[in-house]
């Protein structure tokens, strides 16, 4: 877990032909959602420089709390305080 930046991990998932982006989702900090988090399939995001996009919504990478496989294995997790 946690090898490289979240952007590097997402780029590998999206662009490495050995990976299937349909097998992954991200959990982001999203105020107003249940538990203040939101789950987004990696297949729905586009990577940018300091942000990623879900449709036309721009979201900073620092909002990502976890990158998780469908089987529940966490492949990247934020070092934010208090994250369980």
UniProtKB/Swiss-Prot annotation:
Domain of life: Archaea
Entry-linked Pfam families: MJ1316
Stored InterPro entries: MJ1316, UPF0248
Family that this chain belongs to: Belongs to the UPF0248 family.
Protein name: UPF0248 protein PF1300
